[in-house]
Amino acid sequence: MFVVTRAKFKKYLVKSIGFCLWLFSVNALSSPITLDISYVKLVKAPVAGTSNFFKKPDDSGFQGAKLAVSDSNTTGKFLQQHFSLSYFVATKTPQFLDHFEGQYQQGRRIFIIDAPLAQLVQLDRWAKNKSVLLFNISETADELRDSQCLSSVLHTIPSDAMKSDALAQWLLYRRMNKVLLIQGSKDEDVLLANSFKRSAKRFGLKIIDEKQWDFNTDLRRSAQQEIPLFTQTVKDYDVVYAADKSKSFAEFLPFNTYLPRPVIGSAGLEALAWHSVIEQWGATQLQNRFIDMADRKMNELDFSAYLAVRSVAESVHKLHTNKSNELIAYINSVDFELAAYKGRKLSFRPWSRQLRMPLALVHPHALVSQSPQPGMLHPITELDTLGFDAQESQCELSR
């Protein structure tokens, strides 16, 4: 006589349910999925006074997206998913905008964008009532995360506010509270300086003096004479913050200031999403794969593009669909998490579409620290101590 005990029945039931789930998953994965991703770049006018030494390679960003597609296809081949990448470079705004409409008519819905603020705003208007995913990988302006929010654009590049907060937290942690602020004369430098002023106020730092560099001196020949005089102040300072996006003068500040003090911001210690010195959490393997593919080191723009493609690919892996409306809903949901060689999962802020992430504090040849700094507390996640939190931002994309 065959007797089924309660324990055996539970065992058979679990196996049966597992088998049914396996059959369901096999059936769900029976149809292959393909997804085309468009990388679109608008060539920016060169900034006067920028040294060729600091110019990024022309393929910055695209190579990161290319590696992400390769990594995604490694997983995708087991799930019957395939990703492809197209590349388009525009030199004029009309050509840039027309390309999106053409791609949209051909059925493409995922776009990786390397373009300035004005064109991102235009694209967001174009994307209204369209099921498209737009990823900003290069524009760091705080305006897009605070006062001029874009409902169709996700930001994988950290904002100026996130970088300023990362540095300000480190200064607070090291008790370097007195700051000399030096800014360039360009509009982008003024905005960067304003971003740091916000961070200084937020974390209780004191800016003892502000100076603007608007000289045309060839610092390659005169830095040792010019900069000590320029950085002489009545009050003592612990650190010099440089706001110089194009690096026309900032790199000449270290070791030339009147007082022997560290330089942060646009030179010296910088806050970046990625740098070649990052090696933890599997980053070394990513760095090596990138060097093998691109024959150069991975920079922040490459990493931002990598994150954009991986955000899409992870969503496709999870949902097994290429329908853009479903991918958009998932990426913007609390369920979305992205593993990104940062030691923790990343996600997008629902109120501004900004990807929250730790930032590396680096100088050219070493990692110094990572922000958020120890002791920084937040009711939801300490990652939101970097940049505009929900209560600070005017964005209402999720409200």
What is each stretch, according to the model?
Residues 16-18, 28-29:
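Cleavable N-terminal signal peptides
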